[in-house]
UniProtKB/Swiss-Prot annotation:
It is an enzyme of class 3 (hydrolase). The keyword Hydrolase applies. GO terms for molecular function: bis(5'-nucleosyl)-tetraphosphatase (symmetrical) activity. It catalyses: P(1),P(4)-bis(5'-adenosyl) tetraphosphate + H2O = 2 ADP + 2 H(+). This is Bis(5'-nucleosyl)-tetraphosphatase, symmetrical. It comes from Aeromonas hydrophila subsp. hydrophila (strain ATCC 7966 / DSM 30187 / BCRC 13018 / CCUG 14551 / JCM 1027 / KCTC 2358 / NCIMB 9240 / NCTC 8049). Keywords: Hydrolase.
Length: 273
């Protein structure tokens, strides 16, 4: 059995299927791990969701910022933008079933037997692994419960940008969501920045990647994430895997296979501007 981790798909369904064929992914024996942002910007978010949902327990996916935004659009919280290419999904007969499935995806996923943790954007430098787990479960329970509409209506915003253990209510939940789904850079005091989307070498002075700000512990799991296409898979750390390589921007879609540490990519020139 192989554990195959894939970066942001963003509706690039044909590229996903081509990559899985290239990696000889076998849904009867292997497990597909997806770093979130299944939808938006690419041409076929609908079939991407249908395919991943259809894999059942052979697929594990975490929520990304575009996935949460889709839920907000469907609930009337946010406008449907033409550039997101979600109209077909919004009009699909199985729309509600797909969105209900998506709403129940986690913010953080872990392998039950292997030292691997997966999120969409990252883990706050202020958190250890245990805090990250607990924070993820807090917001997941809201998304899956009766308060999910309230959460979708109030999740947008950049504040607070710093963590305190005594944060409560929507400020706490917004920080948790932003950390797991939007974060790239931090200031040296740990505050989150949401403006700079470039790579570390081109970043604004005073910022550093969130994974450079985190303390490393010997027993930390391998951390797999997506979201940050400008990294092009480069973190400089063996135990931190960045898998968003900008498929929807015309670069490539990348798969990392845990068992043999193989990186497999397929070019996606169709989407190049």
């Amino acid at each position: 059995m192989a554990n195959c981790f894939v970066g942001d798909i963003q509706g690039c369904y044909d590229d996903l299927r081509r990559l899985l064929d290239l990696a000889e992914f076998d849904p009867a024996n292997d497990v597909l791990w997806l770093c979130g942002d299944l939808v938006a910007r690419g041409p076929d978010s609908l079939n991407t969701l249908r395919f991943v949902k259809g894999l059942g327990n052979r697929a594990v996916t975490v929520l990304g910022n575009h996935d949460l935004h889709l839920l907000a659009v469907a609930d009337g919280v946010a406008p449907l933008k033409k550039k997101d290419k979600l109209q077909e999904l919004m009009e699909a007969p199985d729309r509600d079933e797909l969105l209900e499935w998506l709403r129940h995806r986690p913010l953080l996923a872990e392998h039950p037997d292997l030292p691997i943790m997966m999120v969409h954007a990252g883990i706050s430098p202020a958190w250890d692994a245990r805090t990250a787990r607990n924070c993820a479960r807090e917001v997941e329970s809201l998304l899956r419960g009766d308060q999910y509409q309230w959460l979708l209506h109030n999740m947008y915003g950049d504040q607070p940008d710093g963590w305190q253990d005594d944060l409560v209510g929507i400020e706490r939940y917004r920080y948790i969501i932003n950390t797991f789904t939007r974060m790239r850079f931090c200031y040296f005091d740990g505050r989150l920045d949401f403006k700079c989307k470039k790579g570390p070498k081109e970043s604004t002075p005073g910022l550093r990647p969130w994974f450079e700000q985190r303390e490393h512990h010997v027993d930390d799991p391998i951390l797999v994430f997506g979201h940050w296409a400008a990294l092009m898979g480069n973190t400089g750390k063996q135990d931190i895997k960045a898998l968003d390589t900008g498929c929807v921007w015309g670069n490539s879609l990348t798969l990392w296979r845990y068992e043999d540490d193989a990186l497999i990519a397929t070019p996606c020139p169709t989407y190049a501007k």
